[in-house]
């Protein structure tokens, strides 16, 4: 048997749902999708869900992760085994851990390939900081996976599809996560997974102010802007959602233009599937040039304005 009888899907990020649903179609006979509202439910059915389970009734001061109890109960009530697919977001990984505990299931994070053999999931993901690919065969009846962006193609919606909708009512967990405060952050409205052209900046850009040079190039060629992990996590120059690498975005654009990025393996894992890689770096020995199809050795601050002017003609 090369499929599960049932797969359960949940995405806290709507843009990741089409990819997860496409993977679900390949891995199971019946697709169940947990959603938070009616609009997401309608989208899930168009993407192939046979059953939609609307999570309802959570108090405003509680976290989505506290739906884990009722989600696990619902999964158990509809089969003695199954596959759970979640995005490899922070919330996805936290929810995966909670579901794994409640289902007595093995959990595998950041999956880059998934297959089913004899009713058991086989999962591949990066290990040793991206230096190798590990393969795991999950033996537990339930398997909980968080999926790296780009692992599956994106499912296409079909308005003619139909499915059944159910409501799953909130039940307060024995130990709850209570939200005590919220802090607004800059939202990322760009879906980098779908970008044809990507300009990505590293610390070699020099300063937060110099990122404007990359933004001007993006505008000239119709590209989207991304970054390396240090730019987002260490320097805080850009939002977390834009960094490319093993623990976040895995992109497959037609062009990936790396500006001031050294090219460590942890970053290149997220960019190496690009059709063409173009690198700009003042260090001629930077590892990025081993991956690049084209490269310029020089100061990005001087090269970017000239490149923008040439391409804007």
From Swiss-Prot:
A Pfam family hit: ETF
Protein name listed in UniProt: Protein FixB
Sites where the protein binds FAD: 255-283
Pathway the protein takes part in: Amine and polyamine metabolism; carnitine metabolism
Protein's gene: fixB
GO biological process: carnitine metabolic process; fatty acid beta-oxidation using acyl-CoA dehydrogenase
Function: Required for anaerobic carnitine reduction. May bring reductant to CaiA.
Quaternary state and interactors: Heterodimer of FixA and FixB.
UniProt record similarity statement: Belongs to the ETF alpha-subunit/FixB family.
Species annotation: Escherichia coli O6:H1 (strain CFT073 / ATCC 700928 / UPEC)
């Amino acid at each position: 048997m090369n499929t599960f009888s049932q797969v359960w899907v949940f995405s806290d990020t709507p843009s990741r749902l089409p990819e997860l649903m496409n993977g679900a179609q390949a891995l199971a006979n019946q697709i169940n999708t947990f959603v938070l509202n009616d609009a997401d439910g309608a989208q899930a059915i168009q993407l192939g869900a046979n059953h939609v389970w609307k999570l309802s009734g959570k108090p405003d001061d509680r976290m989505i992760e506290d739906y884990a109890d009722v989600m696990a109960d619902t999964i158990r009530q509809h089969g003695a085994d199954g596959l759970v697919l979640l995005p490899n977001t922070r919330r996805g990984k936290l929810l995966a851990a909670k579901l794994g505990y409640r289902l007595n299931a093995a959990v595998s994070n950041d999956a880059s390939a998934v297959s089913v053999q004899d009713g058991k999931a086989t999962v591949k993901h990066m290990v040793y900081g991206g230096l190798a690919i590990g393969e795991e065969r999950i033996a537990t009846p339930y398997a909980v996976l968080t999926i790296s962006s780009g692992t599956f193609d994106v499912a296409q919606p079909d308005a003619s599809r139909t499915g059944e909708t159910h409501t799953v009512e909130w039940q307060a967990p024995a130990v709850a996560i209570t939200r005590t405060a919220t802090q607004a952050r800059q939202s990322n409205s760009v879906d980098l997974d779908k970008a044809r052209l990507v300009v990505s900046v590293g610390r070699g850009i020099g300063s937060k102010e110099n990122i404007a040079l990359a933004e001007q190039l993006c505008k000239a060629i119709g590209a989207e802007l991304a970054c390396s992990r240090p730019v987002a996590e260490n320097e805080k120059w850009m939002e977390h959602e834009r960094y490319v690498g093993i623990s976040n975005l895995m992109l497959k654009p037609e062009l990936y233009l790396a500006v001031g990025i050294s090219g460590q393996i942890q970053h290149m894992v997220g960019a190496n599937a690009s059709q063409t890689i173009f690198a700009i770096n003042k260090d001629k020995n930077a590892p990025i040039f081993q991956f690049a199809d084209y490269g310029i050795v020089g100061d990005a601050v001087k090269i970017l304005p000239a490149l923008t002017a040439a391409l804007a003609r």
